[in-house]
């Protein structure tokens, strides 16, 4: 298959192919323009993969541009986080990072040009009055009483705005379009508002700041963007995008194209709702492993490759739809099944004593790091007469479907011996505290010599060599597929979204590094946590289970 055939295809790429074939463009130039007022989430990853992926596939350029026109909500912390997320996903922007604030002087000059042409005016209605005058979808708006000021008066008032002569909310600059337009976005939209706030890039140079719709199209044009890709909620805004560029003296007129945003089950994408989760401490921060933020997914153990694969699979369309969480989980599960080394950890431990094993002795058992990849090598794991097994791997009585350890029957310890359960000890409440077994010394990594069949295999950790670990079992943050539709989305938070266990792991995991994934055999995929791990305490996060347990629960 050729490189071109291997590329994903969608309506945007078809437009680009036509533009290149017709000679309309010879180089493709896209951009990713986040506002630095929060952390990026999986929905932004779709836009990142689309814009940077197109530039990559067509040997073009993609800018990273911060839409930093509201200093009240923005912070350099978010700028740094966004840059880190884009790079972590595996993409690189063209040249230096761009900022809309880089163009404040040009934007101001274009605003003056619109005033000079009689296409913009300074309005002194209050924000509430502007909303009232705007009308509704069924009713046209009303002209502001300040709409017909002369060009000279508007120029003087706009300069007064710029030099701090008005208080916040007392004046704004509006485009003069059509208050009866069927599209509310075209009813004399605000182009500039007053904000006495220090900007993280320009300091206190400005006290007037341009609105998104005015800034976005001009920034695209100044950067030579050929295809401006936005999500569907900006579809009506395209009319204003084109109006601004049609009415100023600028040589380049990019085109805006809209695609559906990413909606994902069992989570929320609204910045307001995500912020509420953080500020009300329902989660521990923006990088909480249950959050849909890129930093949260990264801390949970998701790989950049799995997120890119997910964005590739869901594709790009004009139709809004909701993607199953299982689709995202299958991407990371497939990635880690292929690439994660194996290790053993016992999450809910109970002691197993092998009574006929040489007392006080131990031995090393060789285990492959990956069952299907000999090139990943092997490791030596200590084995002894006292081990930890998972409590769920033993029953005093069980039916034939239970393939683990049962009283009076045998089971294989992974890559070690066959053991037989002989008796148990219990505490005062009747809980099993110790399982006593015997072992067949001739079954190290081989079948019993007499040909008897031992079907079950369980994992284990040598008690004398065990590494105490905290294991954080993360699950879906919400208990319903569409929490955003709930009357109170906080009421449907999954109470089991985080369960903390104290367990034991094989000693090789002492050398685990944050972010590196492992398959804990028979348990799932885990990675060392970057926040809570210390030299004395190893904390592992569950990235995803070995299979989709939610699908079974929903049947």
Curated annotation (Swiss-Prot):
- Reactions this protein catalyses: tRNA(Gln) + L-glutamine + ATP = L-glutaminyl-tRNA(Gln) + AMP + diphosphate
List cellular component terms (GO).
cytosol
Residue segments, region Interaction with tRNA = 317-324
InterPro entries on file:
aa-tRNA-synth_I_CS, Gln-tRNA-synth, Gln/Glu-tRNA_Ligase, Gln_tRNA_ligase_bac, Glu/Gln-tRNA-synth, Glu/Gln-tRNA-synth_Ib_cat-dom, Glu/Gln-tRNA-synth_Ib_codon-bd, Glu_tRNA_lig_a-bdl
Q: Which SUPFAM superfamilies match?
A: Nucleotidylyl transferase (SSF52374), Ribosomal protein L25-like (SSF50715)
Positions bound to L-glutamine: 67, 212
Q: Which family does it belong to?
A: Belongs to the class-I aminoacyl-tRNA synthetase family.
Q: What is this protein called?
A: Glutamine--tRNA ligase
Taxonomy, top ranks, is: Bacteria, Pseudomonadati, Pseudomonadota, Gammaproteobacteria, Enterobacterales
């Amino acid at each position: 298959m050729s490189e071109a055939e291997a590329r994903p295809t969608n309506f945007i790429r078809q437009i680009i192919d036509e533009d290149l074939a017709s000679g309309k463009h010879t180089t493709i130039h896209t951009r990713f323009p986040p506002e630095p007022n929060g952390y990026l989430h999986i929905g932004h990853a779709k836009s990142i993969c689309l814009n940077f992926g197109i530039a990559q596939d067509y040997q073009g350029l993609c800018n990273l541009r911060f839409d930093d026109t509201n200093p009240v909500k923005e912070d350099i912390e978010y700028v740094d986080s966004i840059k880190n997320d884009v790079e972590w996903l595996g993409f690189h922007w063209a040249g230096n990072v761009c900022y809309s604030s880089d163009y404040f002087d040009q934007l101001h000059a274009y605003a003056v040009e619109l005033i000079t042409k009689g296409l913009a005016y300074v309005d002194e209605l209050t924000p509430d009055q502007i909303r009232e005058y705007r009308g509704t979808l069924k009713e046209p708006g009303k002209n502001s009483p300040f709409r017909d000021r002369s060009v000279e008066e508007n120029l003087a008032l706009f300069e007064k705005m710029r030099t701090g002569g008005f208080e916040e909310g007392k004046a704004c600059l509006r485009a003069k379009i059509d208050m009866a337009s069927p599209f509310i976005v075209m009813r004399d939209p605000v182009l500039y508002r007053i904000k006495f706030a220090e900007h993280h890039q320009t300091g206190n140079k400005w006290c007037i700041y341009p609105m998104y719709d005015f800034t976005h199209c001009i920034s695209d044009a100044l950067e030579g963007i050929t295809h401006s890709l936005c999500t569907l909620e900006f579809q009506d805004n395209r009319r204003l995008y084109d109006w601004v560029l049609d009415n100023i003296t600028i040589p380049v007129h990019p085109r805006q194209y809209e695609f559906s945003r990413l909606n994902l089950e069992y989570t929320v994408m609204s910045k307001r709702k995500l912020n509420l989760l953080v500020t009300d401490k329902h989660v521990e921060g923006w990088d909480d492993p249950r959050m849909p933020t890129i930093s949260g997914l990264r801390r949970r153990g998701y790989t950049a490759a799995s997120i890119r694969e997910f964005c590739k699979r869901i594709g790009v369309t004009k139709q809004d739809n909701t993607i199953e969480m299982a689709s995202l989980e299958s991407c990371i599960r497939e990635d880690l099944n292929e690439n994660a080394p194996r290790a053993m950890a016992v999450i809910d431990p109970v002691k197993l004593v092998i009574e006929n094993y040489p007392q006080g002795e131990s031995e090393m058992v060789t285990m492959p790091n990956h069952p299907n990849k000999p090139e990943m090598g092997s490791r030596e794991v200590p084995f002894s007469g006292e081990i930890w097994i998972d409590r769920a791997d033993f029953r005093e009585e069980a039916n034939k479907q239970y393939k683990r350890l049962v009283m009076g029957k045998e089971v294989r310890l992974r890559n070690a011996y066959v053991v037989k359960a002989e008796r148990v000890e219990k505490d005062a409440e009747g809980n099993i505290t110790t399982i006593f077994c015997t072992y067949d010394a001739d079954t190290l990594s081989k079948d019993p010599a007499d040909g008897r069949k031992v079907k079950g295999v369980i994992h284990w950790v040598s008690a004398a060599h065990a590494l105490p670990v905290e294991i954080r079992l993360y699950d879906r943050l919400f208990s319903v597929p569409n929490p955003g539709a709930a009357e109170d989305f906080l009421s449907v938070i999954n109470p089991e979204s985080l369960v903390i266990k104290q367990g034991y792991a094989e000693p090789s995991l002492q050398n685990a590094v944050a972010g590196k994934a492992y398959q804990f055999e028979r348990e799932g995929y885990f990675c060392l946590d970057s926040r809570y791990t210390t030299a004395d305490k190893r904390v592992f996060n569950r990235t995803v289970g070995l299979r989709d347990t939610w699908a079974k629960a929903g049947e």
